[in-house]
């Protein structure tokens, strides 16, 4: 009968750790879109109405004759003028200095008095701490995107979202936008600035060889996961 030779437990643990590190290196960085809601919405079917016998039908597409054509219903479109310019700077510093000094003169007694007149005890200590830190960030995003009204809130505000895709030289670029728009901020040209949109989420991403060139290789991720520094 053949005897099965088992690997030592230390070797098994090392092999498992190496395999786990290799799998971690092969794993891709998760990329979840920040815009989670649907990119478009279809308006509900209009209720069938009896023809009134006139040229103007008040129920046609929900568009009143003597009111502006601003979006107000699900499925209407709106142009978002993206004009984001954010600059942030932060700096901090701390400095602490503490010093202490103690001196005792103790008279000696008994036979020690002939050897030492006094016993001197002294102690000194110094504690210093200094730290500085700073951070700065600058982001600029300009462009336009047309979105669709996906929901109308009870107070009349419009929940909008939309997506724009561009295929340029085998590189697919995505621009996604979502937020809540107050109809009073919509201009006569049926547009609104992104700075006037509440809960705005703007996403710009791409897929293609350019995006792959910016991704760290699996061997680099492997050594990055096991490096102790």
Curated annotation (Swiss-Prot):
UniProt membrane topology term:
Lipid-anchor
Q: Name one GO molecular function term.
A: cytoskeletal motor activity
Q: Which residues form the signal peptide?
A: 1-25
Return the InterPro entries for the record.
Flag_Lring (IPR000527)
Q: Where in the cell is it found?
A: Cell outer membrane; Bacterial flagellum basal body
Keyword Translocase found: no
Q: Which GO terms describe its biological process?
A: bacterial-type flagellum-dependent cell motility
Q: Where is the lipid attached (N-palmitoyl cysteine)?
A: 26
Concerning its family, UniProt says: Belongs to the FlgH family.
Question: What's its job?
Answer: Assembles around the rod to form the L-ring and probably protects the motor/basal body from shearing forces during rotation.
The UniProt subunit note reads as follows: The basal body constitutes a major portion of the flagellar organelle and consists of four rings (L,P,S, and M) mounted on a central rod.
Q: What is this protein called?
A: Flagellar L-ring protein
Q: Which gene encodes it?
A: flgH
């Amino acid at each position: 009968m053949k005897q099965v030779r088992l690997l030592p437990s230390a070797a098994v643990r090392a092999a498992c750790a190496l395999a786990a590190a290799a799998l971690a290196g092969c794993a891709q960085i998760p990329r979840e879109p920040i815009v989670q809601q649907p990119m478009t919405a279809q308006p509900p079917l209009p209720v069938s109405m009896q023809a009134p016998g006139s040229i103007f039908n008040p129920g046609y597409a929900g568009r009143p004759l003597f009111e502006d054509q601003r979006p107000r219903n699900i499925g209407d479109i709106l142009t978002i003028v993206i004009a984001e310019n954010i600059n942030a700077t932060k700096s901090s510093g701390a400095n602490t200095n503490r010093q202490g000094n103690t001196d005792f003169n103790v008279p000696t007694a008994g036979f020690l008095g002939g050897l030492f007149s006094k016993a001197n005890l002294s102690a000194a200590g110094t504690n210093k701490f200094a730290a500085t830190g700073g951070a700065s960030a600058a982001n600029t995003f300009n462009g336009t995107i047309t979105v669709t009204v996906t929901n109308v809130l009870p107070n009349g505000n419009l929940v909008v979202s939309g997506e724009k895709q561009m295929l340029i030289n085998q590189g697919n670029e995505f621009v996604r936008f979502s937020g809540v728009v107050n109809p009073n901020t919509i201009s006569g040209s049926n547009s609104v600035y992104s700075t006037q949109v509440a809960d705005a989420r703007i996403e710009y991403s791409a897929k293609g060889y350019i995006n792959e060139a910016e991704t760290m290789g699996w061997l680099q991720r492997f050594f990055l996961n096991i490096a102790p520094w």
